[in-house]
Amino acid sequence: MQVKRFFAADMRQAMKLVRDELGADAAIIGNRRIAGGVELTAALDYKLSALAPRVPNAELEEELRKTHTRIATAQAELDHRQDSSDNNRQLFAGQSLTAAEPLIEPHVDAPEAAAAPAPAAAPVDPRLFDAMRSELSGLRELLEVQLGSLAWSQLQGSKPQQANLWRRLQRIGLSGPIARELLDLTAEIEEPRQAWRMLLAHLARMIDIPEIEPIEEGGVIAMVGPAGMGKTTTLAKLAARYVLKYGAQNLALVSMDSFRIGAQEQLKTLGRILNVPVTYVDPGQSLAAALEPLLRKRVVLIDTAGLQASDPALRMQLETLAGRGIAAKNYLVLATTSQKQVLTAAYHSYKRCGLAGCILTKLDETASLGDVLSLAISHELPVAYLTDGPRIPDDLHLPRGHQLVSRAVNVQQQDEPSEEAMADMFADLYHNPRRAG
């Protein structure tokens, strides 16, 4: 029997390493979380004689589903216990906690006796909760990968036409839940080409696009997002678009980016070229006070700093934008060249300030639009603008759902997706279960 350990950043990558080196017959005999990722222990020619006879696929899938549900339930119970433990520490601070006394049936003839004090409950080490949560997370991720592989294999055998549509959606880069929703909408269509056309039409309708262009609606508009997404360039395109259409007298620019070298100089140059006033807001300075002299302007465009999620200044910036008296419409600027994890992290970091929508940049450089479209659809983020080049303002466009979908199809992967990629797509379905209702 050949036994080997594999290290990777996440469970899916670890499973791929196992498959590549030991093949599909390898058995996973251990897994644990480590610093920087996961560790899998896999074996080849693992003796299974002590185990129960092989279960048919349908039954195996059902058991895996039950186990997946149990893990989710255990995770919820763990969270509940930790919350209860925290609440008890707050409610009984300064008091000694005792274990509950056993229930004693009343007996009239028995003489009353003073109950002996119960021993104090031992404090729970928070590290125990962390270890349990980490182990549960690893088990859940492993199950998701296995369930995804099993579900994909069964679909290929039972519904080859639908499996082909899944492959085409995976080439676009759409997430598993979005693909499933699209296929549910076209389940009754048997002709493959018609089904594909309807899938794309439904996808176009899923993309939320504002009825009124943001700069036409007016008000305070802020560009938010991580560094490198194209916030300042997008702001320059919006400002030039407005000036060319309405003139410079009702436009003002504001910079909250005092962290990046040369950021304020860029905006100062833009203001000079467009003949538009530029206001600079330093950290800790009141944004409301800075905006007060600009209240008569029809449009105020704000450029913000692209800060890391761990930077304390980011929280201050988001709280400022979400503060009373600001009424800013915050648009998350997302580079379509970014990886899925980067896009997801950006959304979760910046949603705290309240997002009015998103602006998709660098469409001319991207190799896939699936990840960013999946994010916008799943989080109901309206797509306000698109940019696809360096020209100001010529490379700024209003989105159209069918044009975005057409572009996504045009830049899709040329090669057929691997079996591992399809299994990962199905694993995403278990990681993001269908919502009730």
Swiss-Prot record:
Protein localization: Cell membrane
One cellular-component annotation, GO: plasma membrane
Binding site for GTP: 225-232, 303-307, 361-364
Keyword Protein transport: yes
Any GO molecular function: GTPase activity
Record's bilayer topology term: Peripheral membrane protein
Keyword check for DNA-binding: no
Alphabetized SMART domains for the sequence: AAA (SM00382), SRP54 (SM00962)
Signal peptide (from-to): none
A biological process from GO: SRP-dependent cotranslational protein targeting to membrane
InterPro entries (alphabetical): AAA+_ATPase, FlhF, FlhF__GTPase_dom, P-loop_NTPase, SRP54_GTPase_dom
Pfam families assigned to the protein according to its UniProt record, in alphabetical order: SRP54
Keywords: Bacterial flagellum biogenesis, Bacterial flagellum protein export, Cell membrane, GTP-binding, Membrane, Nucleotide-binding, Protein transport, Transport
Disulfide bond residue pairs: none
PANTHER family linked: FLAGELLAR BIOSYNTHESIS PROTEIN FLHF, SIGNAL RECOGNITION PARTICLE RECEPTOR SUBUNIT ALPHA
Family label: Belongs to the GTP-binding SRP family.
Function per UniProt: Necessary for flagellar biosynthesis. May be involved in translocation of the flagellum.
NCBIfam families: FlhF (TIGR03499)
Record's protein name: Flagellar biosynthesis protein FlhF
Species in which this protein is naturally found: Pseudomonas putida (Arthrobacter siderocapsulatus)
Taxonomic lineage from the root: Bacteria, Pseudomonadati, Pseudomonadota, Gammaproteobacteria, Pseudomonadales
